[in-house]
């Protein structure tokens, strides 16, 4: 199934939490930090403000950091995604 977000919305897929700390300690269950890093899988066309089209700054494939309490979680074809507004994306990770 393909998903196409509307307006200035973006579909992201969370990246997996780290299994191990830098010092080599294996993390299990609730000890893993919830990731706020994700990969962009779909991007809306942008929005129109006062008759001016606002282009999207992110593109498919970008790795991004997003606000902790934003977006809507959805499940499609057994995969979990989040749909959020571009304004809830804090940075692009290069």
UniProtKB/Swiss-Prot annotation:
Heptamer of 7 subunits arranged in a ring. Interacts with the chaperonin GroEL. GO terms for molecular function: ATP binding; metal ion binding; protein folding chaperone; protein-folding chaperone binding; unfolded protein binding. This is Co-chaperonin GroES. GO terms for cellular component: cytoplasm. InterPro entries: Chaperonin_GroES, Chaperonin_GroES_sf, Chaprnonin_Cpn10_CS, GroES-like_sf. Pfam families: Cpn10. Keywords: Chaperone, Cytoplasm. The keyword Nucleus does not apply. It comes from Clostridium botulinum (strain Eklund 17B / Type B). The keyword Cytoplasm applies. Together with the chaperonin GroEL, plays an essential role in assisting protein folding. The GroEL-GroES system forms a nano-cage that allows encapsulation of the non-native substrate proteins and provides a physical environment optimized to promote and accelerate protein folding. GroES binds to the apical surface of the GroEL ring, thereby capping the opening of the GroEL channel. NCBIfam families: PRK00364.2-2, PRK00364.2-4, PRK00364.2-5. One of its GO terms (biological process) is chaperone cofactor-dependent protein refolding.
């Amino acid at each position: 199934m393909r998903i196409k977000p509307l307006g200035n919305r973006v579909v992201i897929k969370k990246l997996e939490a780290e299994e191990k700390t830098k010092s080599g300690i294996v993390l299990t269950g609730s000890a893993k930090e919830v990731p706020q890093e994700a990969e962009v899988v779909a991007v809306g066309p942008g929005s129109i403000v006062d008759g001016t089209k606002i282009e999207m700054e992110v593109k498919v494939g970008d790795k991004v950091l997003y606000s902790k309490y934003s977006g809507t979680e959805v499940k499609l074809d057994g995969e979990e995604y989040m749909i959020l507004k571009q304004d809830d994306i804090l940075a692009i990770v290069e």
